[in-house]
Every structure is written in structure tokens, then in C-alpha cells.
Amino acid sequence: MPKNKILIYLLSTTLVLPTLVSPTAYADTPQKDTTAKTTSHDSKKSNDDETSKDTTSKDIDKADKNNTSNQDNNDKKFKTIDDSTSDSNNIIDFIYKNLPQTNINQLLTKNKYDDNYSLTTLIQNLFNLNSDISDYEQPRNGEKSTNDSNKNSDNSIKNDTDTQSSKQDKADNQKAPKSNNTKPSTSNKQPNSPKPTQPNQSNSQPASDDKANQKSSSKDNQSMSDSALDSILDQYSEDAKKTQKDYASQSKKDKNEKSNTKNPQLPTQDELKHKSKPAQSFNNDVNQKDTRATSLFETDPSISNNDDSGQFNVVDSKDTRQFVKSIAKDAHRIGQDNDIYASVMIAQAILESDSGRSALAKSPNHNLFGIKGAFEGNSVPFNTLEADGNQLYSINAGFRKYPSTKESLKDYSDLIKNGIDGNRTIYKPTWKSEADSYKDATSHLSKTYATDPNYAKKLNSIIKHYQLTQFDDERMPDLDKYERSIKDYDDSSDEFKPFREVSDSMPYPHGQCTWYVYNRMKQFGTSISGDLGDAHNWNNRAQYRDYQVSHTPKRHAAVVFEAGQFGADQHYGHVAFVEKVNSDGSIVISESNVKGLGIISHRTINAAAAEELSYITGK
């Protein structure tokens, strides 16, 4: 049996044909029928050789015609069968006679890996699986159109090649004599000659278009992904879209409201137009009764280097402790009823009213928290200090006037709970249910309640120093046990004595450098006149009043800076208190309002600069 028939036999009997056709042999078939047919066939061959030759020649012609006809029209592939060389019941002869010779040659292609024939190679060649196996996997939607177009292009080129080969075979058959026995071999080789070239030419174009096809496929995938996402959002996320839209609308509305809202606790544009530098004395239009006082703080000096240690402390006062006791019960009840920190409320009252000693806090105003505006139509104007960083300025503003301190406490809680016009939740982050601790509450107040950059730091220091967190507990503390002694210091000691306000009658504006030196000198048993005016006038006016004035540093004396001298104010000048004179001629001074509103700080002046300053010895 020829090699081609063996290959087809292997394929047909082991893989493909047994599932498509009925069996060709049975166990109970009589053996004699087969023997008779074989004997008859052999007898016919031995008796008539010439007939066999003629028949063979005719068979070759018919095979050539069949091959040509099959290549022109695949629908006629199985139409013509030669009865003398093929039996109708022999499926092997049936396939072999009607399979184009070009496909037979393809079946013999050697495996490029093993350099021999394999069953996989035969199957691949039989079904024209000449490309990578991944090409026959299920394509993605985005790639389907691209793969189909490439396949159609390949099939079109292949059909053109087969047509050209068929026409070439037909022309060669017409030229060659029929008696030539090499004609079948020629017809087998002829179609193979152009194939190594033609398929390569046809495959070159798709290869050059791979990048374009991949880009197109990528765009299609992206477009389909976007469309799928939009479809999912449309179908399942209408509520989410609506929520997002409402949130964006509300956020925009809140932003517009906040931008258009004027916080009465902060200076208005009109008030800022009339701001001025803080006055250092009660001269001209600045009166004591119209000036608002606040609490004081002090930084501890480091004894070793005579400079600030950086620690921020409260100036302790017995008056402050008595003030805490006077408002503690009301503050505790209001805090429990309104979800706010009583500790923060009391600390703000201490800071804003100077523990109830400010003229704004006293009768008939009773404003403990420095709340601006009007209460039931009642307000009172006051000069007050505001801060822009560490730079202070003075403005005149209207403050609410209350009939009693209880109304002041209640109005404060209403402000914290209900906010201001246009922004009802401005102080919501200070509530106990919103803030994790009182420090979170004071941090928010520093941005929305006051201009002082140290506002939160001051409140936290007051709460810690006076142990105010106990008033945040559900149970009211025992006020009889709320007592803490104030340390007594030896005036002759080298230790720095904490500042205390010792005079009720104050001739200088509260918190100013002049006010501080006036109190500090009295704390050490000396005094100075209360009518010396602004700081840069002190040395001249003191000398006129028979005070000892010189350029020699002296401990516990007042030191005067002329206007603009060593960083002093260009208009008012500056005055400080000499805490210590060092052996090298340098001096350590304490002063107020240099590092912020109501802050008492310390610094060292070198010997050369110290000799240029004026010193006033108290009486």
C-alpha cells in the first residue's frame, strides 16, 4: 500500500472516520465472499494485460481531470469515482482518490521540532492548522472582528493561490502527451513550487498590520469597558449617583454660605479699617473703663542661660480660683445638658474676662466670654486687642451686654450649640460627642473664636493649671476641696519670681509693657509713677519727677527702649523690667506683649546694647 494511503488509513481508523461512517468489516462476514472477489480480481489481471494497461491509462487521465475539477470547484470533489481502481465499500480508496494531491503533500510536511512525522503534525496539516494554536482559541469580543478580518484575508489570498495553481496545472496537462507516465508526478510537484513563496507574501501583510490591529483592539476593549461601566452605573447605581449629586450640591452650598458668612467673633472689614497700634497709656481717647482686659501667661526662664525655657505657664492667682468657684456649678450643669466641655467653658471665661476682673465682665455688662454683637438689643463698645500672628493691633468693637453672669453662661452655650447666622454648625467640632478631648475642642476654637495664634495653647494651660477637667465628669466635684496654695517666693532669692498683678487701680492699659512694669516693680517693693505716658517718654518724664535715671544697668529697675531701638515699636518705644545683671555686663529682662497677646517672656541683652539703654530706679 502506498505511503499516502497508510497515513490516511491511520487517521481514518484511529481518529476521525470511525465516528463518522459505519464499520467496513464484521466478525460474521463470510470469508469466502472476500476470497472469491480476490480470486476474480487476480484472474482478471492475469488474463488481460493490455486491458489493464488501457484501463490504467484511462484511470490516470480521469484522476488528472478529477484533480483539476476538484481545485476549480470543491463542491464536485466526491462526484467522479473510477470503478476499476476503487471499490465503493473501501473508504480508504474513496478518501485517497478524492483528496487533492496538494493536501497529500501537506500531510508529508516534517515536524520542525522533531524532524520527523508525528500524529500531531498530520492532524495539523490535514486541517490546515498552519498557525499558532492560540489563534483557534475562543476570541474576546474586542478581538473577534480583528481575527475574522485577518482570517478572511488569509482565505482570500489562499483561494487566489489555489486558483492560479489550478490554471497552471490545466495548461500543463494540455501541453503534455497523455502517454507520459511521469505526468502524475509532475502534477503533484507543480502546485508545490510556488507555495513556499506565495504564503510568505500573503502573511507579510498581516504581520505588518499587527500593531495597528492591536491598537484598534485595545481601543475597542477600552470603549467596551467604558460602555459596560456606564451601563452598570446606570442600572445599579442611580442611588449612588443621586447621593453624590446631592453631596456635591450641599458642599457647594455650604462653601458659598461660609464664604458669605461673617463671623461676629472675628474683626470685620470695617473694624480693620480703623485699627491702630495698641496704646501704652490712657491718653487722649483711650480710657481705662473702655479697655478690655484678658488673662496673662508667662514663659519660665532658664536659670542656667538666662533665656526662655520654652515652657508656657499660667500666672497663678487666688482671684482666679475664687472666680472658678463662683461659676463652676452653672458651668457643670450647662455642660452636661448641652454636650459641651465645662472645662473649656470655664477656661474661656478666665481668659476672656481676666477672671472676672475686666470692665467688660463686671456689672453692668457681665460679659464673661468676650462675645461680640448684641444680646436682646443691648451692646457696649470696648477697645480690644487683636492679633495678626504676633503683631498686635487695637480695634473698637461692640460687645454683648447681659443682665447677669448666668445669662452670659447660657448665651455662650447657645452660641456653641447653634452657631452663627449662615453657619449653624461652626462650633459643632467642639461638642463632647464630636471632639475626642478638650484639646480637640480648643484647637477648633483657635480658628473660629479668636485671632490669637496662641489661643488653644493658653486654654490648655489654664485647664491643666487649675485642674478644670474634673468639671467635665458627670458628678459635680466638691468645691470645698477645690483649693491650691500659691507659692511664696523670697524676694532676695536669685530665682525668678512668677508674675502677679498686685494693684487693683491700674493707670496703664492691661497687658501692655507699661502695665507690666508698673505691676512688676510693685511686686518687688518699689513703685513708679502712673502718669509717665508711652514707653519712649518714661526716661525723660521720670527724670523730671526726680527719679534716678542712668545708663548703668541695675537689678529690678525699669529699662527704657527709645522708638525703634533694638526692635522696639517705631511709634511708642518699649519698656521692660531688669531681672538680673550678669557679670559680663549683659542683662536678663522680662517683658509683656513681645511674644504675643498677654504673654510675659524673657530675653538676654548683650553688654554693648545694655549700655545704650536708659534705666529708672523706683522709689
UniProtKB/Swiss-Prot annotation:
Main location class: secreted
Disulfide bonds: none
GO MF assignments: amidase activity
UniProt keywords, alphabetically: Hydrolase, Secreted, Signal
Signal sequence range: 1-27
Localization in the cell: Secreted
Annotated PROSITE patterns: CHAP
N-acetylmuramoyl-L-alanine amidase: annotated segments: 327-468
Gene Ontology CC, one term: extracellular region
Induction or repression: More protein is secreted in a secA2 mutant, while less protein is secreted in a secG or double secG/secY2 mutant (at protein level).
Low complexity bias (residue ranges): 147-156, 214-226
Coiled coil location: none
Basic and acidic residues bias spans: 30-65, 73-82, 137-146, 157-175, 238-260
Positions with biased composition (Polar residues): 176-192
Region described as Disordered: spans on this chain: 25-83, 134-226, 238-290
Domain Peptidase C51: 488-617
Domain of life: Bacteria
Similarity field: In the N-terminal section; belongs to the N-acetylmuramoyl-L-alanine amidase 2 family.
Name this protein carries in UniProt: N-acetylmuramoyl-L-alanine amidase domain-containing protein SAOUHSC_02979
